UniProtKB/Swiss-Prot annotation:
Major location (coarse): nucleus
One GO CC term, this protein: chromosome
Keywords: Chromosome, Nucleus
Disulphide bridges, residue numbers: none
Source taxonomy: Eukaryota, Metazoa, Chordata, Craniata, Vertebrata
Summary of subunit composition and partner proteins: Component of the Integrator complex, composed of core subunits INTS1, INTS2, INTS3, INTS4, INTS5, INTS6, INTS7, INTS8, INTS9/RC74, INTS10, INTS11/CPSF3L, INTS12, INTS13, INTS14 and INTS15. The core complex associates with protein phosphatase 2A subunits PPP2CA and PPP2R1A, to form the Integrator-PP2A (INTAC) complex. INTS15 is part of the tail subcomplex, composed of INTS10, INTS13, INTS14 and INTS15.
Protein name: Integrator complex subunit 15
Task performed by this protein: Component of the integrator complex, a multiprotein complex that terminates RNA polymerase II (Pol II) transcription in the promoter-proximal region of genes.
Gene name linked to the record: Ints15
Length: 448
């Protein structure tokens, strides 16, 4: 690597960056022929940091700065490299060498360039870059994933009106990236404050993706070898818990949110009407999203069984439901129950539905006693009480298979079982029959 470094020092910044990609491509391609998972050594990472991210190797040396045009040209070089490299394994290891966080001073430059590269790949639909980014999101700590998600949201949902359509179109190009992007976005926007409510354009795009193909949010889960114990501090296998958080907290978060007013240019009435219209659109979108999430949950039992993970792997961890319930309880306390009764009722209804379907499908592994303890401090909700109580079961019916309890034979909660029919009573005594005498006339006189 030292010989390569000396030759690169004589080049300008752009040609050196292009040359280092070329050398590492040859190096890792040869390694892949002998080992399925080549090791990215320290020398390779240092070359990339010095000649791609412009971080000097010598201590005290001033870092080089690329101007905007040079940075754009560097992004084009990288996009072209990943597009032209036909072997996915080589692309993946080069991408990992470039952008895996190292915990050093180069990480800021690394994340900045990654955000710009993925944003460019979205704009020009470079599928190999998006696929590499999807793998990166899957194996990188969540703190870095949300940084990339924030860059894409700012570029396509905040800066230029209407640019969200460009991001929306990658749904068919790279569904795997879309799945990981949704998971990152739900980790970023947790509705804990008004600043962390997802922008309307982002919400509308995600709902349209999931409503068109609900299986989108299961792509990572369905296509990844899964261990029973998932690593902590990384993105979830699916965005299910994040989407449930959105649907459940949305009624309370939007009730808490106050409409923003312009600096005197728009009247209070106009701003209020605009905010009300936006809230109505948001409520419809969250209702649509909630339906899609329930539909996905209902399919999970089959998928978990096929992977031999039913009852062994909870895609929705009980430990993640605990802070969600605490946040709902806190929001309900902050809002005046007299003014937010409908919103509290809606949030608890959605929570109850999600809990019931998730437990039934095997996505949430817990007992009814766990739920009673968890939800004991929440405001009263009829549907939630039914879910917590669970089905009432009596001894099996003799004419039915064991374990089957028809609801018509289930007694009410407050009463004991009563037999449907009393014991058979003795037969009534029979009376002797009367003989018919044909010669006797029947006296009849009409009433006048």
């Amino acid at each position: 690597m030292s010989d390569i470094r000396h030759s690169l020092l004589r080049r300008d910044a752009l040609s050196a960056a292009k040359e280092v990609l070329y050398h590492l491509d040859i190096y890792f391609s040869s390694q892949l022929q002998s080992a399925p998972l080549p090791i990215v050594d320290k020398g390779s990472v240092e070359l990339l940091e010095e000649f791609v991210f412009q971080v000097p190797k010598e201590r005290g040396a001033q870092p080089k700065r690329l101007n905007s045009l040079q940075e754009l040209q560097l992004l084009e070089i990288m996009c072209s490299y990943f597009q032209e490299q036909s072997k996915d394994s080589v692309r993946q290891i080069i991408f990992s060498s470039l952008f895996s966080p190292q915990g050093n001073k180069a990480d800021d430059s690394r994340m900045s360039l990654l955000g710009k590269l993925v944003s460019m790949a979205v704009a020009v639909c470079r599928i190999p870059v998006l696929e590499c980014a999807a793998s990166w999101l899957q194996r990188t700590p969540v703190v870095y994933c949300v940084r990339l998600a924030r860059v894409l949201v700012e570029d396509y949902c905040c800066l230029v009106p209407g640019s969200v359509q460009t991001l929306k179109q990658i749904f068919s190009a790279s569904p795997r990236f879309c799945c990981q992007f949704i998971t990152s976005v739900t980790a970023l926007y947790d509705l804990s404050s008004d600043d962390l409510i997802p922008p309307l354009d982002l919400l509308e795009m995600i709902v349209s993706w999931i409503f068109e193909d609900p299986r989108l949010i299961l792509i990572t889960f369905l296509n990844t070898p899964i261990a029973a114990n998932l690593p902590i501090g990384f993105l979830e296998l699916t965005p299910l818990i994040g989407l449930i958080r959105w649907c459940v907290k949305a009624p309370l978060a939007y009730k808490r949110k106050k409409p923003c007013l312009s600096n005197g240019h728009i009247s209070h009435k106009v701003a209020k009407d605009s905010g009300a219209s936006t809230d109505r659109d948001s409520h419809l979108l969250y209702s649509k999203l909630h339906l899609s999430v329930l539909q996905v949950l209902m399919t999970l039992q089959l998928h978990l069984t096929e992977k031999n993970l039913y009852g062994r792997l909870g895609l929705i961890l009980f430990d993640h439901m605990v802070p969600l319930v605490e946040e709902i309880n806190r929001l309900a306390d902050e809002l005046n129950p007299l003014n937010a009764s409908q919103e509290i009722e809606l949030a608890l209804d959605r929570l109850a539905q999600a809990l019931q379907v998730a437990m039934t499908s095997g996505a949430l592994l817990c007992t009814r006693d766990d739920l009673r303890t968890l939800c004991s401090r929440l405001p009263h909700n009829n549907l939630l009480q039914l879910v917590i109580s669970g089905p009432v079961q009596q001894s099996p019916h003799t004419a039915l298979p064991p374990g089957f309890y028809p609801h018509i034979h289930t007694p009410p909660l407050a009463y004991g079982a009563v037999p449907a029919h009393p014991a058979a009573h003795p037969a009534l005594p029979t009376h002797p029959g009367h003989t018919f005498i044909s010669g006797v006339t029947f006296p009849f006189r009409p009433i006048r």
